[in-house]
Each structure stands twice: as structure tokens, then as C-alpha cells.
Curated annotation (Swiss-Prot):
Function: NDH shuttles electrons from NAD(P)H:plastoquinone, via FMN and iron-sulfur (Fe-S) centers, to quinones in the photosynthetic chain and possibly in a chloroplast respiratory chain. The immediate electron acceptor for the enzyme in this species is believed to be plastoquinone. Couples the redox reaction to proton translocation, and thus conserves the redox energy in a proton gradient.
Organism of this sequence: Citrus sinensis
Membrane topology: Multi-pass membrane protein
Protein name as it appears in the record: NAD(P)H-quinone oxidoreductase subunit 1, chloroplastic
Pfam families recorded: NADHdh
UniProt signal peptide: none
A GO MF term: quinone binding
GO CC annotation, single: chloroplast thylakoid membrane
Database matches in HAMAP family: NDH1_NuoH
Amino acid sequence: MIIATPEVQDINSFSRLESLQEVYGILWVLAPISIYVLAITIGVLVIVWLEREISAGIQQRIGPEYASPLGILQALADGTKLLFKENLLPSRGNSSLFSIGPSIAVIAILLSYSVIPFSYNLVLADLNIGIFLWIAISSIAPIGLLMSGYGSNNKYSFLGGLRAAAQSISYEIPLTLCVLSISLLSNSLSTVDIVGAQSKYGFWGWNLWRQPIGFIVFLISSLAECERLPFDLPEAEEELVAGYQTEYSGIKFGLFYVASYLNLLVSSLFVTVLYLGGSNLSIPYIFVPGLVEINKADGIFGTTIGIFITLAKTYLFLFIPIATRWTLPRLRMDQLLNLGWKFLLPISLGNLLLTTSSQLLSL
């Protein structure tokens, strides 16, 4: 059977069309993910610059100033330097665990950004259990640290990995109980719904005023989860050289460095979403005729304003963990565990009980 030439051309053009549709579908999926990763990377560079400038101000010294004006590109220069460092492997360690550990830590933290609503219409995955997805994913990162410590075949690294796992377990429970209290107030586990519930009552509807005890517990627990001073025992230089990072160099060491600041940024973003109203400014925009509220703005303008408000709240809040790092001394391991199990856990349980009682009485 001979097929006519026009029919063959039609079949070829149809197959090309299907191939183009498949390519466009892949690009449609990869484009927002790539934009998110690029934006998050820029956000990390900004945090590194902010920390260096704030720490310089606290210590009354000049911060980075040689790599571009005001040292803005200093973090990028440091990252480029790490890329060209030699990638060393421990001679008697487990090379598989040693190599996989940093990747697990970074990927687990990056996935947490998928449920953060940067604006009302801008969230990568609006899930009904978004806030619990963040808690579940963040629990994977310490596994990567433990794998890194075990695979290094170094007693300091292994002890640092054990400390990271113990610290994460100790402070994840109070943090989860604080999140449960917020979910009870909002009647939802979706991050978008939690932001929307706070916007109903304006500035005074922020969960910061309705959950002051939970906010303090969440702040302390998130600092411990990020392993920031005074909770940086897994990598205490005076005790463990560099903890689970002792045997790392080059890009793998850079991954741990990036993971630390990614975790700090995502924790600050969740503080903004859970307690500071998210993308809602809660005051009218006086430059728009008719006093149109920013919260009700639609389209590109509303999305842009929402992103700006979210990031402004986040970076203003970041001053607290940065200033804390350069002002408070490191806790001992027994003090850290006592603070988590004997102090924060009972307080967070009591806060959850009070929140549940108030919700039942309001029915």
C-alpha cells in the first residue's frame, strides 16, 4: 500500500506538533522552578551580605568593601572561590554517604520553599497540608548531616552529626506544637489559608498578637533548627573543629554553607507567613484613588506588592537571628537539651491547650 505524499507530510507535521507540545510542557514545568531557585539564590546572597554588614556594625569594624561597592558581591566571590577548591574524599570513609549527605540537606530545605505564599496568587504548591509538609521535609535534613558525619570516618564529624540529630528532634516537637496552635486559629493547614485568616482583621489580626507565647517558642525553636548561635553545637569550632563539616572542602563544603542560609531564610519566611500576616500590609495604599487596599490589588501590581511586603517583613525579622548570633554565648549540650525538653515543650503544650480551649469556648 502506497501512501500519498501530502498524507506523509501531514503525519510528519502532526508528529512535530506533538514533539513541540511535549517540549513546551517540560519548559512550562521547569520555568517556574528555575525562577524560584534563582530568586532563592539571590535571597541567600543578600542574607550573607546583611549578616556581614550587621556583624561589622555590632563589632564596630568595617565590613566587606573590596568586592564591588559596599561588598555586595563578596558572597558571590566566596562561592566562586569554593567552586575551584579541590574536592577531597576521606581515605577510609564511606564515599557514598559522604557525597550524598550535603545534597540531601540542601534538597530537603529547597523543597520547603514550594509551600510558601510569596503573594496571594504566587505559591508553587498550594496544598491542604502545606505547613505539615514543611515540618516533614525539614526533618529529612538532619539525616543528611548524620550521613555526612558517619561517612567522614572522623570522631569529630560523627559527634557533630549525632548532635545535629539530637538537637533537631528536641526542638522539632515544640515547633510543631506552635504550628498546631496556628492551624487551630486558622482552621486550616494550608499556608495560603493561614495568611488569609490573618488578613480578615487587619494589622491586629496577625497571629503575633494572638499567639505571643507561641511566637517566642517558635523563634527559639527555629533558631535551634537552623543551628545558629547560641545553638550551633553540631559545628562548635572550640569543641569539634567544624563538626560534621570537618572533612569537607570545595563545592560540598559550599553546599553546607548554602544549606545553613537557606534554612535561615525559609524559617524567617515561615515566621512571616505564620505570625506577621504574610503578604498582607493591612493598611490602605494612599496613592491609589479611592484608597484601594494593597491586600485587594489584583494582577501583576498586586503580586509585585505582595512579594515586596513578604520580603520586607522577612528581612526585617532576620535582624533578630543575625544580632543574636553576635551577642549571645553558646549553650552547653545539657543546657540545650534541658531548654528544649524541660522548658519549651511544656510551654508549647500549655499554649496548645489554651488555644484549643479558647476555640472550643468560641463555638
